[in-house]
Amino acid sequence: MKKEKTDKFKKYINIYLIRHGMTPGNQEHRYVGRTDEGLTQAARKELEDRREIFQKVDRVITSSMKRCIQTAEILFPYQVPEIQPGLEEMDFGTFEYRNYQELSGDPKYQAWIDSNGTLPFPAGEDLQQFKHRCCQNFLNSLEKIRKASGKDEITFRGFSSLHHHNEENDKETSAVFEQNKNDNEAVKTCVAFVVHGGTIMSILEAFAEEKKNYYDWQVKNGCGYVASTDYENGAIVLRNIKYIEL
């Protein structure tokens, strides 16, 4: 009986995980971490042209970096971005804002390549510490949403909002929408996280139902994922993950 009472007040939250648009450093294939640069003009135009793909969201959460805030303001102009500290990209240390050509021949860079990216960046961040930072602050964001809802329990479920011109995807998302619509006592919230490639990779490696390596979750600039997310017994799992390509 207690479970039935609790289930009546579940709050449904759907999420986007979106990587920021292209920056000058991204164009030149540089390691852009702590460098706080904005979007290129071409990226701004591309995002403006494609923002109809995204459903209206209730909240937008970003890192503190210009490139994420600018992307959020273009895609979701009706929402003020909420900055969540700790969702920033990796600190690349001495590799920061340099590209392969500039680093080629550097013994420290070669050692990092030979380690398959597992070594800490010289004078920068360790990969495992970075992953922990991103995941912890993702959870911190969800906890703020839970508290703001005034409910004791949040269940993250089916994502129905991807307006993509793909018949197969449309059928899948429509089915999920019908499933959620039938639960008429659910309160549905849609949250967009506009962050960095490494941040998204960290979150999905940790919480995706489909287990993949960190590097298998790479995402292009301006693209991202939608997910249906369950939050039960203190454990978060991201399900039904679909890639969004602009």
Task: Describe each PLM feature range.
Residues T62-S63, H132, V194-V195:
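Short beta-strand scaffold positions
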Residues L75-Q136:
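Phosphate-handling substructures
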